[in-house]
Structure formats: C-alpha cells, structure tokens
Amino acid sequence: MDDLSPEEIQLRAHQVTDESLESTRRILGLAIESQDAGIKTITMLDEQGEQLNRIEEGMDQINKDMREAEKTLTELNKCCGLCVCPCNRTKNFESGKNYKATWGDGGDSSPSNVVSKQPSRITNGQPQQTTGAASGGYIKRITNDAREDEMEENLTQVGSILGNLKNMALDMGNEIDAQNQQIQKITEKADTNKNRIDIANTRAKKLIDS
C-alpha cells in the first residue's frame, strides 16, 4: 500500500467496499433463507401438534365409550341371569395399575394434561424481532457513503435474524420434546384401550355363547 498513489488507494478502498457490500448481501440472503426454513419447520410442528392432540382426544373418547360398553355388558349379564362377579367389571379394569398409570385416577385426560405448547416467539408466521447491533455499529467506516449504510443495515438484519434463529431452535427443541412425550402417552393409551376392548370382546362372546 505504501507504493500506491492516493488515487490508487482510494480506488482500492472503493473496490473493497463493493466486495464487502456484496458479501453482506449474500450473508443476508442466506440468513433470510434459513429463517424462512425455520418458520416452515415451526409451522409443521404446530400442525403436527394439533394432529397429536386430535389423536389423543380420540383415545380419550374410546376410553369413555368402553366404560359405557362395559356397563351395558354388565346389565346384559344380569338380564340373562348370568353370574356377575361381586366387583363391577369396569371398576376392576380402571382400578388396575396399568390403567391408572396411563389415565390417572380420573380416567380421562384433562385439557391441562394434553400437550398444547406451541412455539411462543412466532406470531402469524413472523418471528419476534430481537435487538440489533450495538450503538457502535457493525462496520468500521472508510468511504462513509450509502454502500456502508447498506452494509450496516444488512448486518443489523443478519444479527436480528440470528437471534430469531436461536429462539426458534430453542422453541423447536422444546416442542419436539413435548411431542415425543405425547406420542409415548398416546401409545400407552392405545395399548390400554386395546386391552380393554379385548376383555370386553371376551365378555360379549361368552354372553352370546351362553
């Protein structure tokens, strides 16, 4: 640089500024693409969470329906003069350890027990903006022109997007953990419902064959 004339130094400064500006534009473009991908992932997780809620509600409804079906079987046994165990069949099933472990004492999942947590920092598909650059700015100004203004703005946006991406990653991790727990709960409910249905089918077959 010592061998360069003032004009050449100025030309080189403008060249570096142009290259730096293009770099910040590319970085901003990549950051926006990453943010868009994150928003789409958040939306998909939200939709998946709603589907899991509907599935779990279906398991709860089957549980309620089976309780009524067991009551009907007990009444039919009485009407047919068949021997009924002293303990109510439904009570016996619902007092079992596996049933209580799955459904709790109430036998139904209250709304508070259904996983409903959704990402909190996304509103209508738009991430909540975080704070931008510090008061000193991101770049050291050389030419002090509109290009450096754009570079500063680009890097400020990148900094904000990176903050949003961090928040989205935390939200996605929490939501995935919650959904994994809900899937495990749904599996347990499905197994318990199947066992309950099998027992009811056996009782119904005995009633038909009697």
Swiss-Prot record:
Q: Which GO terms describe its biological process?
A: exocytic insertion of neurotransmitter receptor to postsynaptic membrane; exocytosis; histamine secretion by mast cell; membrane fusion; protein-containing complex assembly; regulation of exocytosis; synaptic vesicle fusion to presynaptic active zone membrane; synaptic vesicle priming
Cellular component, GO annotation: adherens junction; azurophil granule; cytoplasm; cytoplasmic vesicle; cytoplasmic vesicle membrane; GABA-ergic synapse; glutamatergic synapse; mitochondrion
Residues forming the t-SNARE coiled-coil homology domain are 14-76, 145-207
Q: Where is the lipid attached (S-palmitoyl cysteine)?
A: 79-80, 83, 85, 87
Broad class of the protein's primary localization: membrane
Q: Which residues cross the membrane?
A: none
Return the annotated region ranges for Disordered: 104-136
Q: Where are the N-acetylmethionine modifications?
A: 1
> Which protein family is named in the record?
Belongs to the SNAP-25 family.
Q: How does it assemble?
A: Homotetramer (via coiled-coil domain), also forms heterotetramers with STX4 and VAMP3. Found in a complex with VAMP8 and STX1A. Found in a complex with VAMP8 and STX4 in pancreas. Interacts simultaneously with SNAPIN and SYN4. Interacts with STX1A. Interacts with STX12. Interacts tightly to multiple syntaxins and synaptobrevins/VAMPs. Interacts with ZDHHC13 (via ANK repeats). Interacts with ZDHHC17 (via ANK repeats).
Q: What is this protein called?
A: Synaptosomal-associated protein 23
In its UniProt entry, the species of origin is given as Rattus norvegicus
Identify the coding gene. Snap23
